[in-house]
């Protein structure tokens, strides 16, 4: 693992050359992210502005891949709310965990089959059930479905809106493979969640 000061130095050099304006870290622990920005402050360097981890309503129980980190943790959410640093979430819809159960199971089976040629025996796949299914997340899904009924949308829309509705700048990366997947995701942009709903969905 490279020292954080080396990253900050190189990224500041790129900024000074006019190649970038802001920068951040992907799959960094909050401790490492803080360390980098503290070093930047002490050395009159520009800080990292963006943390790029997984931030989904469902908390990861197994990493999508080795080194993948979740920002749905109280310490990280508090830090982002206090500092107003931006967050760009990968797998922001938890790989389809909040879709109808039948569809989620189909996605799980498809991903498991496609990864079987290179996964080690006994190693979990990166499917939605392998990485997100837990008692707490099933309760989050139940609450998302209940709120979706009240707002006239899908639970998946509620989950995506949860990521976008944080009290800090929060952006969601999505990977639709069909026009229909895109069309059924975009309604999340019209949903507004208040802080009480955000906390309730996340079991806070």
Functional labels for PLM-detected ranges:
Residues 1-203:
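Beta/alpha (TIM)-barrel catalytic core signal, keyed to glycine-rich beta->alpha loops juxtaposed to Asp/Glu
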């Amino acid at each position: 693992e490279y020292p954080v000061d080396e990253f900050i130095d190189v990224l500041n050099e790129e900024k000074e050359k006019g190649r970038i304006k802001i920068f951040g870290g992907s799959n960094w622990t909050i401790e490492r992210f803080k360390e980098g920005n503290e070093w930047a402050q002490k050395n009159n360097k520009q800080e990292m502005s963006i943390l790029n981890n997984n931030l989904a309503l469902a908390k990861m129980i197994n990493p999508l891949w080795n080194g993948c980190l979740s920002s749905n943790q109280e310490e990280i959410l508090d830090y982002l709310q206090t500092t107003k640093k931006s967050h760009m979430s990968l797998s922001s819809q938890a790989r389809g965990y909040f879709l109808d159960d039948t569809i989620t199971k189909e996605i799980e089976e498809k991903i498991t089959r496609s990864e079987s040629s290179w996964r080690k025996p006994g190693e979990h796949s990166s499917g939605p059930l392998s990485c997100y299914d837990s008692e707490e997340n099933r309760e989050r899904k139940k609450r998302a479905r209940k709120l979706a009924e009240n707002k006239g949308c899908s639970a998946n829309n509620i989950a995506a809106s949860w990521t976008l509705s944080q009290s800090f700048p929060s952006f969601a990366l999505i990977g639709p493979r069909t026009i229909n997947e895109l069309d059924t995701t975009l309604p999340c942009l019209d949903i507004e969640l208040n802080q009480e709903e955000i906390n309730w969905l996340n079991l806070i």
